[in-house]
């Protein structure tokens, strides 16, 4: 294991200043049995460096935004140039128009878009819009999927809620949690039954078109198409949370790859190039109901921040270069193949779920289609794998 003396010292100080010593639960690394986590000070390309001078090959990429790697020259240059002209104005800027135009052109469902500062904000705003436009209260989501930490989403959620083993939704009033119906991912029959039991009450169905927060779980053939058909029939607003998949699995996101167009889409991570940007958008008749054009309110002091927008634009323009997604597919396929080969050599049960450059190794036998399948994976083996990789500088 690498020398982490300075990381240990700083983490002990952090524990007295911040809950769990971190500003986001997944950074604590408690679920993988590692304390302290390395405190990082620098990144370049595929590598990151900690305060103790250790170097690691990084497969996290700031949890998704850094698809070009750390300190990508074109992104750094765009940020520096924009920051030199001002960090923010509290007024609209040309970059916001450029980013909105690029997003609308790229993502099939987007006719209009609103920039915000995080994926959480995008999802909570899209839900408010769906409820306001439909006049209905209830939400359908899926077990193990994570849509940020807004109250309505913290029911059978994924991401840190899942890995930290947090039960239910403490701090969320029962009356709010009761409006969220959480169903098994990939179970279209369960969705139809929930709609039947609550006629005229479901405002929206929100789904990660490729689940990423319980590990990567792909939609079964017909699942997304079935959701689209059902929502159309029942006048329910279908929301794709593409915070992870947007511009990761394909230029237009998972909806472009699968050919299924939702009513609203939530974006984040990659569209900010490593800085805080989120977005939600979709049908013009829905988005036109947002203030100031309509009565449904949402606002943000730093929404469309020029420096963050510049980072996002630079990242997306780089992704437009020919061959980018083919290269990501090639690298993802190679990594999945090598993981499977290594597991076979050690006689380990391993299922690798992958789409493009998104992948998860589950230490289990058989397919992983939902949260219950994911929970059957051997967590202790994953901890050993994680710790061994870190010791090897990965």
Residue ranges and their predicted role:
Residues 1-394:
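Conserved N-terminal phosphate-binding loop of PLP-dependent enzymes in the Aspartate aminotransferase
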């Amino acid at each position: 294991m690498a020398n982490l003396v300075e990381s240990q010292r700083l983490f002990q100080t952090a524990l007295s200043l911040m809950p769990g010593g971190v500003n986001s639960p997944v950074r604590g690394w408690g679920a993988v049995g590692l304390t302290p986590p390395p405190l990082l000070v620098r990144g370049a390309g595929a590598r990151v460096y900690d305060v103790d001078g250790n170097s690691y090959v990084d497969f996290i990429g700031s949890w998704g935004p850094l698809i070009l790697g750390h300190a990508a020259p074109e992104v750094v240059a765009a940020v520096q140039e924009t920051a030199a002209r001002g960090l923010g104005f509290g007024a609209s800027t040309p970059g916001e128009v450029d980013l909105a135009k690029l997003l609308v052109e790229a993502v099939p469902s987007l006719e209009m878009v609103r920039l915000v500062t995080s994926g959480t904000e995008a999802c909570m705003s899209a839900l408010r819009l769906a409820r306001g436009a439909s006049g209905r209260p209830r939400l359908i989501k899926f077990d193990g999927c994570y849509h940020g930490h807004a109250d309505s989403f913290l029911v059978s959620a994924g991401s840190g809620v899942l890995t930290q083993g947090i039960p239910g939704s403490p701090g969320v009033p029962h009356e709010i949690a009761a409006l969220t119906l959480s169903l098994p991912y990939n179970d279209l029959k369960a969705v139809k039954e929930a709609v039947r039991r609550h006629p005229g009450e479901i405002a929206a169905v929100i789904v990660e078109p490729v689940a990423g927060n319980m590990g990567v779980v792909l939609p079964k053939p017909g699942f997304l198409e079935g959701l689209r058909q059902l929502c159309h029939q029942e006048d329910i607003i279908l929301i794709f949370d593409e915070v992870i998949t947007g511009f990761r699995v394909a230029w237009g996101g998972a909806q472009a790859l699968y050919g299924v167009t939702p009513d609203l889409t939530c974006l984040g991570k990659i569209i900010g190039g490593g800085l805080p940007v989120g977005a939600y958008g979709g049908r013009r008749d829905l988005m036109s109901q947002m203030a100031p054009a309509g009565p449904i309110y949402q606002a943000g002091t730093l929404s469309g921040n020029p420096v963050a927008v510049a980072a996002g634009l630079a990242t997306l323009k780089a992704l437009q270069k020919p061959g980018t997604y083919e290269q990501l597919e090639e690298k993802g396929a190679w990594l999945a193949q090598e993981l499977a080969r290594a597991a076979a050599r050690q006689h380990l049960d391993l299922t690798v779920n992958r789409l493009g450059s998104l992948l998860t190794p589950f230490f289990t036998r058989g397919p992983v289609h939902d949260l219950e399948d994911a929970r059957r994976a051997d967590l202790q083996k994953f901890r050993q794998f994680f710790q061994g990789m870190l010791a090897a500088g990965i």
